[in-house]
Design a protein with these regions (language model features):
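Ubiquitin-like/PB1-type beta-grasp interaction modules and other compact soluble beta-rich domains
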Residues: 1-63
Length: 64
């Protein structure tokens, strides 16, 4: 699977929310594009990632 331009090995298909949490990313504070399409937050628990997917993850950072 390709994540933010880097290839990683996905041991088995998993839900997007599980994947984000395994990378210490809070699903509330990220935007995700999967194979060129934005994934709605309400779908994070039902979307399944597969080895052939391309994922872009953007984290929101507060500041002033």
């Amino acid at each position: 699977m390709k994540v933010n331009g880097q290839f990683i090995t996905l041991e088995h298909p998993c839900k997007l929310k599980e994947f984000l949490e395994s990378r210490q990313l809070n699903p509330l504070y990220v935007a995700v594009e999967l194979n060129g399409e934005i994934v709605r937050k309400k779908d994070f628990e039902i979307v399944t990632l597969k080895e052939e997917d391309t994922v872009e993850i953007v984290s929101f950072v507060g500041g002033g």
